[in-house]
UniProtKB/Swiss-Prot annotation:
Belongs to the methyltransferase superfamily. L-isoaspartyl/D-aspartyl protein methyltransferase family. Catalyzes the methyl esterification of L-isoaspartyl residues in peptides and proteins that result from spontaneous decomposition of normal L-aspartyl and L-asparaginyl residues. It plays a role in the repair and/or degradation of damaged proteins. GO terms for biological process: methylation; protein modification process; protein repair. Keywords: Cytoplasm, Methyltransferase, S-adenosyl-L-methionine, Transferase. The active site is at residue 170. Residues 33-51, 76-91 have a biased composition (Low complexity). It comes from Burkholderia pseudomallei (strain 1710b). One of its GO terms (molecular function) is protein-L-isoaspartate (D-aspartate) O-methyltransferase activity. Coiled coil: none annotated. It comes from the Bacteria. The lineage of its organism: Bacteria, Pseudomonadati, Pseudomonadota, Betaproteobacteria, Burkholderiales. This is Protein-L-isoaspartate O-methyltransferase.
Amino acid sequence: MSGERAKRFPLALEDLKREPRKPEGRVAERQAAGDAARQRLTAAAAAPAAASPIVPERRAPHGGVFAAKPARAKQHAPAAPGAAKRAPQGGAKQGDRSAAPNVALSGALALTSERVRERMVERLRANGVADPRVLAAMSAVPRHMFVDPGLAAQAYEDAALPIGHQQTISKPSVVARMIELAAAGRALERVLEIGTGCGYQAAVLSRVARDVYSIERVKPLYERAKLNLRPLRVPNIRLHYGDGRVGLPAAAPFDAIVIAAAGLDVPRALLEQLAIGGRLVAPVGEQAGEQVLTLVERVAPAQWRESRLDRVFFVPLKSGVI
């Protein structure tokens, strides 16, 4: 029997006065970790408020101490000074909102802001559009609501955009120019539009004229225009599905007619539906394939005056319906 075991049975008084055992093994490691954790806590108290929060240390069994671990911070939302304050009920935390902005939402808000449309209007004014009613109408109508979502970011650029069925929405500068020519500073009572398309130009016209009649020959575009205009609750637009070259004799005469497609000439039926003193604006194609924005004024029951203005490019004016 070893000397150690010999000391245990029986136990003498001096054997009972043993020194406390020194921490060994994992208990020592725990105590060392606890000391390190306390040092980190002390350092964190002196660090700026932006440091990661520390999880308080927990006592382990048998007197040991578990090491305190830094709380894992969200990668997309680093803490900022004052971020520990609770955000208002129902809202996002300020740190989350600033560190990880929703790009798509920001883009949508930018598109719908008045500032974006105002920049477009400033470009129109710089390009010569002067009628305040036309500029106000262009500023008020949200063009991005009339194009495909994938093209919404380009809605306020001065560009024609596809709307399907081999048709396009005209450039803002062309829309403003045609409406300004048709109005000529007058108070418009009744206006006819040939080629509704997606409904954007009709929406702008509705803010310049008392009543707007618009004809579309492509049935899916006619339905789309109705859907696009519905959220705007425009009460003075009357959409018609039919042949634009025929016009709307039942609603004539019109103070102004705006044709959003190019033919080799202006249909006679539309000239007849123009009121005396009325103005018709249309792109007219030439044999060489070029198109010219043309203004026609009815000066007498059987007399019209024609003026050729700007070079333009429009989809062709066709007969019938599809």
